[in-house]
Amino acid sequence: MADSTLHQPAYPVRFVTSAALFDGHDAAINIMRRILQSQGAEVIHLGHNRAVHEVVAAAVEEDVQGVAVSSYQGGHVEYFEYLASALRDAGAGHVRVFGGGGGVIVPEEIERLARSGVRIFSPEDGQRLGLPGMINELIQTCDVDLTGERPAVEAVLAGERTALARVITCLQQDALPAADRDALLAAARDRTVPVLGITGTGGSGKSSLTDELVRRLRTDQQDKLRVAILAVDPTRRRGGGALLGDRIRMNSLDGTHVFFRSLATRGGHELPHDIDAVIAACKAAGYDLVILETPGIGQGDAAIVDHVDVAMYVMTPEFGAASQLEKIDMLDFADVVAINKFERRGGADAVRDVSRQLLRNREAFGADPADMPVFGTSAATFNDDGVTALYQHLLELLGARGLPVDEGVLPRVQTRVSTRFAQIIPTARVRYLAEIADTVRTYHARTRDQVAAAQRVQRLELVAAELPGDAAVADLLARARAELDPENAALLARWPEVAESYRGPEQVVRVRDREIRTTLRRESLSGSSIPRVALPRFTDHGELLRFLRSENLPGHFPFTAGVFPFKRDNEDPARMFAGEGDPFRTNRRFKVLSEHSEAKRLSTAFDSVTLYGRDPDERPDIYGKVGTSGVSIATVDDMKALYDGFDLTAPTTSVSMTINGPAPTILAFFLNTAIDQALDRFRAAEGREPTADEAADLRARTLATVRGTVQADILKEDQGQNTCIFSTEFSLRMMADIQEWFVRNKVRNFYSVSISGYHIAEAGANPISQLAFTLANGFTYVEAYLARGMHIDDFAPNLSFFFSNGMDPEYSVIGRVARRIWAIALRDKYGAAERSQKLKYHVQTSGRSLHAQEMNFNDIRTTLQALIAIYDNCNSLHTNAYDEAVTTPTEDSVRRALAIQLIINREWGLAMNENPLQGSFIIDELTDLAEEAVLTEFERISERGGVLGAMETGYQRGKIQDESMLYEHRKHDGSLPIIGVNTFRNPHGEPERTLELARATEREKQSQLDRVREFQRRHRTQAQAALARLEEVARTDENIFEVLMDAARVCSLQQVTETFFTVGGQYRRNV
């Protein structure tokens, strides 16, 4: 759509954008809010997982014309109808509601929601209008003047939020009558309301610090004070749009005690032109404190000082040389300075240097620099004592200026800087990714040198054979052999024996006193003898050594071709994802999926209520999602029903659980279920209760034998998937506690984390970024666990990986590149043993490549993706069902998806061979290209302070969003051909089809509500004691998971989640 045809708004158009409750799929809404901004809208972006009441509160306080919400997790009908109703009830019925959810929202539901006043965009709308066209419709529909309906001044003075919000709109547009304006100013003058100004450099964490200060004020003063926050962000000179990105960072806005308004500068430099009148309106509305936060400023900006009573300047330790402080204008005027992100290198030096600069600026030369109002804070650290010290100092200053404060409940702190922040990665280790890149490149450089040395040795051996007894030749040969490392000489010397062991009809290996026989050849219908592992035919020793060091056979370092010598004969890699409704329905689905397989490989999808650590509830925006797009699990009893009939300790049973934020609690439910199964079997067999020693032995044996994986990858959640619920710091502590508990209890066959690239890819990343970010996250866990004092070989075998497969060429080598980098780094960088060097990974075919148009074509895409995953020796595989673009898969579509794998593994002829990619020129080329691209990305992340440092600046999220934007644009303009979507479209249109939509039934939803309430009633007394103990331990350095294992027996999921919120803090969203 050309710029000349876009609607040019006549009025300031404002939108609230978000993803729905319990929905982390924010790639689409991020694209939409970016285009809204570019077309001139002011966007208040709330991010993912937003309840209806949060969206309504934002719409009212921000006085927007429109709300745009994406919903991909089901429950959309209930959510949008509840949203429209709640807006009307809040006096904001004029706000237009827009939504989208790809093919998940079917035409009948779109029509139903239209009758409720909700405009849903379908995939067909996207094809017809394109991205700019859809956004243009939003802008055009919402280009209305809100100032025509002005509230009475009495309504503002009475504290009505809708009235205050509209008055601010009128003030910004110079549309408030002079009499009303004067009345507000007069009312403001009659009240003593201090104004706290917060300004500072961009990226210093002003919003996070503001949120932490407000949270402390509410806790300390027991919600006796009302606070109005005005957050200013700049208007873009080109286009006039603005990203108003402060509200997304706030976790302290619940209830009616805090009013929050985002303001665009609209032509002003640092502040809107009528900011004083806006502040006065907040005072007149009865608020006790006004906080004004301005955008990031340069060294010479101090405009905020003229509008506030107390001015605070926020900066970080990275200001350069101390002489740069002399150029910062605000240091002449600030009442308080906060050095945020104090945990970074140079934090203490920054506090010292700024204190000395303030002393000079104030000409207080006789004073102690330590008495200057400079605080070292870490707003990202939950309950940081440096922030508390800052809060208590500000409270004194504001109290002196009229803020009616009580004594408060927070104990006084005796520090001015953070003392308790935890360094997850020690400062000395922050360059770990650059070191790994160097390790891998050094390995390959040595390979090139050794290839040349091997070739020289071979040539000289031939010469020596032709000239026996020649001393000069013998001397040259001896020197050449000395240049060949003994390890590499041994590889070449062993090769004939290794090759011979693969040429017979079977290979016999003795393990202790057991003999393992493996058939080496399979016969085709034509009588051809197909080798399970094909061998290279190199005669040149250099090329052979290059193969052995760069690839090698499956099961041999560097494991490029696979971590095991052969695939299991009795177990396909299929691991099918299932979960819908209540535990009983999903249990039945598991039994159907596994009935024809001796190995029971169960992969569990949880509903979004569970994914966000909540219990089922009647509230419409929750109720609609119970048991939808996954199974509802709220208690250990639910978990027992889910896996009833499966022996969780059988060597042929393996359970995968895709859950992240509340993963510790779900894992505790699962392990208790496995233990209770063992105890029940003992009771049934022996007819009595086990003794204490017998029970302990059964527990230990269960933990040692249970097989499976819990995803629990919190780093990728922050970067792409968005089911983080606790603060990142607390979540990482819990991950380390789980792994430490695994080590103590000898849990060797269960993966404590599935380091996942799949969701990074689903959020929009290309295959290189998916692989680089995922491996970088894996190495971050390695460094974090080493820093906790664990030994590499105690925890590395408990790490697994999870990748997406798509249509891009790099997906053909994603597994082999990952295995090679991991093996080289673990051996040569970390000194790990062979078991730790083996990277094992699960593959799921791409959900993003499933399209609602021409859905039958989806199985073709899935088949190709499954083929390359099997060729690359993935350790397990899930093939998506063709109808997942629209609904949770039906039994029929799941059967078809499983058949894809079965046909490849059992019918496809080339699958008789287990290393079909080796020897391909293009695969070799792609492997090297992808590996180098990953190593280069490691260096980029390292430059930003490693994975955690890069996350702090939003590097990974930004890159994923950019790559998602590129894909969507190319899909919509047709330059990326997608068959049946933007090319080769059905000339007769989409055939009418009646899809079976998989949804939880009313009976299942109500049953889950009844079950969790009954569980809580039954365990009320025990739960209170268990939660108190859990909170106590979480405040110390003890292992939380040890106590959680007990608490999980008597507490529901939400009870544990809320306890962890109290002691660990909530996740703070990023734009």
Curated annotation (Swiss-Prot):
Q: Which cofactor does it need?
A: adenosylcob(III)alamin; Mg(2+)
B12-binding domain ranges (all copies): 12-149
Binding-site list for GTP: 203-208, 249, 340-343, 952, 1070
Stretch list, region Linker? 401-558
Catalyzed reaction equations = 2-methylpropanoyl-CoA = butanoyl-CoA; GTP + H2O = GDP + phosphate + H(+)
Region (GTPase chaperone MeaI), start-end ranges: 153-400
The answer to keyword Membrane applying to this record is no
Highest taxon listed in the record's lineage: Bacteria
Q: Which GO terms describe its molecular function?
A: cobalamin binding; GTP binding; GTPase activity; isobutyryl-CoA mutase activity; magnesium ion binding; methylmalonyl-CoA mutase activity; pivalyl-CoA mutase activity
Span of the signal peptide: none
Q: Which keywords belong to this entry?
A: Chaperone, Cobalamin, Cobalt, GTP-binding, Hydrolase, Isomerase, Magnesium, Metal-binding, Multifunctional enzyme, Nucleotide-binding
Pfam families per UniProt: B12-binding, MeaB, MM_CoA_mutase
Its annotated function is as follows:
Catalyzes the reversible interconversion of isobutyryl-CoA and n-butyryl-CoA, using radical chemistry. Also exhibits GTPase activity, associated with its G-protein domain (MeaI) that functions as a chaperone that assists cofactor delivery and proper holo-enzyme assembly. Does not exhibit methylmalonyl-CoA mutase (MCM) activity.
Q: Which NCBIfam families does the record cross-reference, listed alphabetically?
A: acid_CoA_mut_N, IsobCoAmut_IcmF
- What name goes with this protein? Fused isobutyryl-CoA mutase
Q: Which organism is it from?
A: Nocardia farcinica (strain IFM 10152)
Q: Which gene encodes it?
A: icmF
